[in-house]
Amino acid sequence: MSTDHVSTHPDSPLHGNGIGSEAINLAAIRQEYTKGGLKEGDLPDNPLSLFNRWLHEAIDAQVDEPTAMLVGTVSPEGQPSTRTVLLKDLHDGKFIFYTNYESRKGTHLAKNPYISLSFVWHALERQVHIEGIASKVPAGESDTYFRQRPYKSRIGARISPQSRPLKSRMQLIRNFVAEAARWVGREVERPAHWGGYAVTPHRIEFWQGRANRLHDRFLYSLQPDGSWQKERLAP
């Protein structure tokens, strides 16, 4: 992760005399990475084993939102888009998350299933970057997870036209109240437009911060026979 690529243009408001604030020099903001390193001899043959270890270490370290990941998709026109989503399962070698299928990411994935996932654990000076292909999970699996969600989250999933223009927050609240009234005393059903994606990875990179920006980076690439090739990358 680099903090050196920043705008220092003199016309930037960060260098101006903002009302009630002082100028900020972004180029001077940096930190040294001292938490440790990553050695070739410590790498397992399967990257999912290392990911599991790092994720559990992030959870044990009480990192904020340890399952948060930046999900990248691309529109049919080639326009990239990212957003933060929570990892909800890692099953059979696949990374699973849930969302609105009619959202921007859902419409992207319907046309182009290639996807990227990035985990950043600042407190541990670690990142994991994943590239793969997304596919919808079976409806039964989405139903099972939906039933585990808090009641109000289930109602919200039913009424939110995710990624589309909304007249006002009050309209969203009215829709929520009306939908909740429809399900009093009944099990809230999963709407057809909401469900899970399973990401099958073919490229996983592990990044560990090191002193002097000489970071450790190791890339796992999936091979035709199902094995993973490991190689060190320059920082």
Curated annotation (Swiss-Prot):
<comment type="pathway">
    <text>Cofactor metabolism; pyridoxal 5'-phosphate salvage; pyridoxal 5'-phosphate from pyridoxamine 5'-phosphate: step 1/1.</text>
</comment>
<feature type="binding site">
    <location>
        <begin position="30"/>
        <end position="33"/>
    </location>
    <ligand>
        <name>substrate</name>
    </ligand>
</feature>
<keyword id="KW-0560">Oxidoreductase</keyword>
<comment type="subunit">
    <text>Homodimer.</text>
</comment>
<dbReference type="GO" id="GO:0010181">
    <property type="term" value="F:FMN binding"/>
</dbReference>
<dbReference type="InterPro" id="IPR019740">
    <property type="entry name" value="Pyridox_Oxase_CS"/>
</dbReference>
<dbReference type="InterPro" id="IPR019576">
    <property type="entry name" value="Pyridoxamine_oxidase_dimer_C"/>
</dbReference>
<keyword id="KW-0664">Pyridoxine biosynthesis</keyword>
<feature type="binding site">
    <location>
        <begin position="98"/>
        <end position="99"/>
    </location>
    <ligand>
        <name>FMN</name>
    </ligand>
</feature>
<feature type="binding site">
    <location>
        <position position="207"/>
    </location>
    <ligand>
        <name>FMN</name>
    </ligand>
</feature>
<keyword id="KW-0288">FMN</keyword>
<feature type="binding site">
    <location>
        <position position="88"/>
    </location>
    <ligand>
        <name>substrate</name>
    </ligand>
</feature>
<dbReference type="InterPro" id="IPR011576">
    <property type="entry name" value="Pyridox_Oxase_N"/>
</dbReference>
<feature type="binding site">
    <location>
        <position position="145"/>
    </location>
    <ligand>
        <name>substrate</name>
    </ligand>
</feature>
<comment type="pathway">
    <text>Cofactor metabolism; pyridoxal 5'-phosphate salvage; pyridoxal 5'-phosphate from pyridoxine 5'-phosphate: step 1/1.</text>
</comment>
<dbReference type="Pfam" id="PF10590">
    <property type="entry name" value="PNP_phzG_C"/>
</dbReference>
<feature type="binding site">
    <location>
        <position position="104"/>
    </location>
    <ligand>
        <name>FMN</name>
    </ligand>
</feature>
<feature type="binding site">
    <location>
        <position position="149"/>
    </location>
    <ligand>
        <name>substrate</name>
    </ligand>
</feature>
<dbReference type="InterPro" id="IPR012349">
    <property type="entry name" value="Split_barrel_FMN-bd"/>
</dbReference>
<feature type="binding site">
    <location>
        <position position="127"/>
    </location>
    <ligand>
        <name>FMN</name>
    </ligand>
</feature>
<feature type="binding site">
    <location>
        <begin position="162"/>
        <end position="163"/>
    </location>
    <ligand>
        <name>FMN</name>
    </ligand>
</feature>
<protein>
    <recommendedName>
        <fullName>Pyridoxine/pyridoxamine 5'-phosphate oxidase</fullName>
        <ecNumber>1.4.3.5</ecNumber>
    </recommendedName>
</protein>
<feature type="binding site">
    <location>
        <position position="105"/>
    </location>
    <ligand>
        <name>FMN</name>
    </ligand>
</feature>
<dbReference type="InterPro" id="IPR000659">
    <property type="entry name" value="Pyridox_Oxase"/>
</dbReference>
<dbReference type="Pfam" id="PF01243">
    <property type="entry name" value="PNPOx_N"/>
</dbReference>
<keyword id="KW-0285">Flavoprotein</keyword>
<dbReference type="GO" id="GO:0004733">
    <property type="term" value="F:pyridoxamine phosphate oxidase activity"/>
</dbReference>
<feature type="binding site">
    <location>
        <begin position="83"/>
        <end position="88"/>
    </location>
    <ligand>
        <name>FMN</name>
    </ligand>
</feature>
<dbReference type="GO" id="GO:0008615">
    <property type="term" value="P:pyridoxine biosynthetic process"/>
</dbReference>
<feature type="binding site">
    <location>
        <position position="153"/>
    </location>
    <ligand>
        <name>substrate</name>
    </ligand>
</feature>
<comment type="function">
    <text>Catalyzes the oxidation of either pyridoxine 5'-phosphate (PNP) or pyridoxamine 5'-phosphate (PMP) into pyridoxal 5'-phosphate (PLP).</text>
</comment>
<feature type="binding site">
    <location>
        <begin position="213"/>
        <end position="215"/>
    </location>
    <ligand>
        <name>substrate</name>
    </ligand>
</feature>
<comment type="similarity">
    <text>Belongs to the pyridoxamine 5'-phosphate oxidase family.</text>
</comment>
<feature type="binding site">
    <location>
        <position position="217"/>
    </location>
    <ligand>
        <name>FMN</name>
    </ligand>
</feature>
